[in-house]
Regions:
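Generic alpha-helical propensity signal that fires on short helical segments
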Residues: 36, 41, 71-73, 97-99, ...
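Gly/Ser/Thr-enriched, mixed-charge loops and adjacent short helices
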Residues: 5-12, 114-225
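Short, flexible active-site loop motifs that bind/organize anionic cofactors or intermediates
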Residues: 26, 82, 121
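N-terminal small/polar loop signature for handling phosphorylated ligands or for N-terminal nucleophile
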Residues: 52-114, 198-225
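Active-site flanking residues adjacent to catalytic metal/cofactor-binding acidic residues
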Residues: 21, 107, 185-189
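An N-terminal, well-structured beta->alpha segment
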Residues: 2-70, 74-77, 150-184
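Short, glycine-/Ser/Thr-/acidic-enriched flexible segments
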Residues: 23-24, 60, 110-111, 123, ...
Length: 225
């Protein structure tokens, strides 16, 4: 990272600016990782759980650092944070809309200026009312979780798995699942088993994997799905 890509790691940096659907500031003075984390937390605190939000960076070193700060802020509010590989803003907007996310944040670096562009569940730039809510949450300060169970899961979006996961979620009676949490053992191929596990974890269930040994099929019992 060159001198011109310097980042100040301090909570005493000057406050960032909210302009339309964008939160921006100088990367070496205002938009610190701590500030980006607070924006992510304020953005995620508006969602009804369970929920997930996507985060993407334009690819510059500064934007990648801020991306991980935003992911941590989202997860701190119990919302699952999904990292998306570097992509254009229009491609990210499409990803948010098609993967069942409650919203998304695109981290862009324009010279010295770093900006976070906020999207709703339809991949549309956040409305003025929603941005006022995010700004109020940002100014309110930290809302720290008290239990590990209150933290969201940080994962990666890869397209096909997320589409399958969204289809499973659409066919689940969420209220019943949330009110009847238990532990299940899953016997399934690696890829589908991973998706099913994530769905159950999002709903607060405990998951045990039953793996095949010596080339045999996974072992099933009365708790296996």
């Amino acid at each position: 990272m060159s001198c011109k890509d310097n980042i100040v790691w301090g909570s005493t940096a000057r406050r960032v600016e909210f302009d339309g659907c964008i939160v921006h500031g100088y990367a070496d003075e205002q938009m610190t990782p701590e500030a980006a984390l607070r924006v992510g937390a304020a953005f995620a605190s508006r969602f009804a759980l369970p929920a997930k939000a996507a985060v993407c960076a334009s690819g510059e070193p500064i934007s990648v650092v801020l991306k991980y700060a935003v992911l941590a802020g989202i997860a701190s509010q119990g919302v699952d944070a999904e990292a998306v590989n570097a992509a254009s803003m229009s491609a990210f907007s499409y990803t948010v809309r098609k993967t069942g996310c409650a919203g998304g944040i695109y981290v862009n670096n324009n010279g010295r200026n770093a900006e976070l562009v906020l999207f709703d569940e339809n991949g549309i730039e956040l409305s003025p009312d929603a941005m006022r809510s995010v700004r109020a949450g940002f100014l309110f300060g930290e809302q720290k979780p008290t239990l590990d169970a209150e933290l969201g899961i940080i994962g990666n979006l890869n397209g096909l798995e997320e589409a399958y996961e969204q289809r499973l979620l659409c066919g689940i009676w969420r209220e019943m699942m949330l009110n009847n949490k238990r532990t299940l053992r899953i016997g399934a191929p690696e890829q589908s088993g991973r998706v099913i596990s994530r769905v159950l974890l999002r709903l607060g269930w405990n998951v045990e994997r039953s793996c095949a040994e010596n080339g045999l099929s996974p072992v099933f019992d009365e708790n296996t799905i």
